[in-house]
């Protein structure tokens, strides 16, 4: 795995506190080596706001492992749900998706179809204005978990600037 894989690991470990991405990837590859049906081993990707920055890396991982990537979007019940990709301003969300699609569309196989369909559909969904309450809640959770979301978001200055402005 190149740098993209380690970056995916960083975000995965942030989202799934306690996950050891290197061990998970080793286990996944071992599972692939003994699976007898492609439906036995598939990547499961829930797009969160920080996970949105991993679209290309998840696409690459799916291709590298030659496995399907099942894709869904984080549920959003209120505008306090700052971890939802729908908390981003619509223009920024669409730009990030469009940049990913330019990269992915010429390379995609049927194994990335769900990923492509979900992110295209994401552009049709309503976004919302996140609250400072939602940001404070996330910062509180970061403190408990001894994490820092800004380290993840700093991978894309546009997203970090948005986060800082809340």
Whereabouts are the PLM-identified features?
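Radical SAM/AdoMet-radical enzyme domain recognition
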Residues: 1-76, 80-83, 92-93
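Short flexible/disordered coil segments
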Residues: 7-9, 65-73, 100-117
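Weak global preference for isoleucine
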Residues: 15, 47, 73, 82, ...
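Acidic-enriched, low-complexity/disordered segments with a strong bias for Aspartate over Glutamate
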Residues: 17-20, 44, 66, 80, ...
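PAPS-dependent sulfotransferase catalytic core
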Residues: 79-106
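Radical SAM enzyme core and accessory elements
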Residues: 105-166
């Amino acid at each position: 795995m190149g740098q993209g894989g380690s970056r995916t690991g960083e975000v995965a470990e942030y989202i799934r506190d306690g996950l050891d991405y290197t061990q998970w990837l080793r286990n996944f590859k071992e599972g692939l080596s003994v699976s007898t049906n492609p439906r036995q081993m598939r990547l499961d990707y829930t797009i969160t706001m920080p996970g949105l920055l991993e679209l290309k890396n998840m696409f690459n991982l799916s291709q590298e492992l030659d496995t399907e990537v099942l894709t869904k979007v984080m549920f959003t019940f209120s505008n306090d749900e700052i971890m939802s990709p729908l908390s981003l301003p619509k223009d920024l969300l669409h730009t990030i998706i469009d940049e990913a699609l330019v990269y992915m569309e010429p390379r995609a196989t049927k194994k990335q179809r769900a990923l492509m369909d979900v992110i295209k559909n994401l552009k049709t969904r309503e976004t919302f204005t996140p609250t400072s309450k939602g940001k404070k809640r996330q910062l509180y959770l970061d403190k408990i978990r001894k994490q820092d979301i800004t380290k993840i978001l700093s991978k894309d200055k546009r997203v970090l600037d948005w986060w800082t402005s809340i």
